[in-house]
Amino acid sequence: MKLLLLLLTVTLLLAQVTPVTKCWGKSGRCRTTCKKSEVYYILCKTEAKCCVDPKYVPVRSKLTDTNTSLESTSAV
């Protein structure tokens, strides 16, 4: 009986823990630091980072190439 009471108490305490805030269409989680396998592009309302798995982030356009500059293309 004591074991059952202990189990019930622990379960109720774990249920009261605040849930993690979701972001990026429920694919990301608001954290202060992201895991090594995650990236962030926006901030959450609590000024935490919205950590997202890179496979859920849209691919960046190849128009912004850092190796070319406007000066070299306009000199032609």
From Swiss-Prot:
Q: Where is it localised?
A: Secreted
* Biological processes per GO annotation: defense response to bacterium; innate immune response
Query: Tissue specificity, please?
Result: Abundant expression in the male reproductive tract only.
The record lists its disulfide bonds as: C23-C50, C30-C44, C34-C51
Report one GO cellular component: extracellular region
The superkingdom of the source organism is: Eukaryota
Alphabetically sorted, this entry's keywords are: Antibiotic, Antimicrobial, Defensin, Disulfide bond, Secreted, Signal
Q: What does UniProt give as the signal peptide span?
A: 1-15
Matching Pfam families, A to Z?
Answer: Defensin_beta_2
| Alphabetical list of InterPro entries matching this protein | Beta-defensin, Beta_defensin_dom
Q: So what family is this one in?
A: Belongs to the beta-defensin family.
| Role, per record | Has antibacterial activity.
Q: What is this protein called?
A: Beta-defensin 121
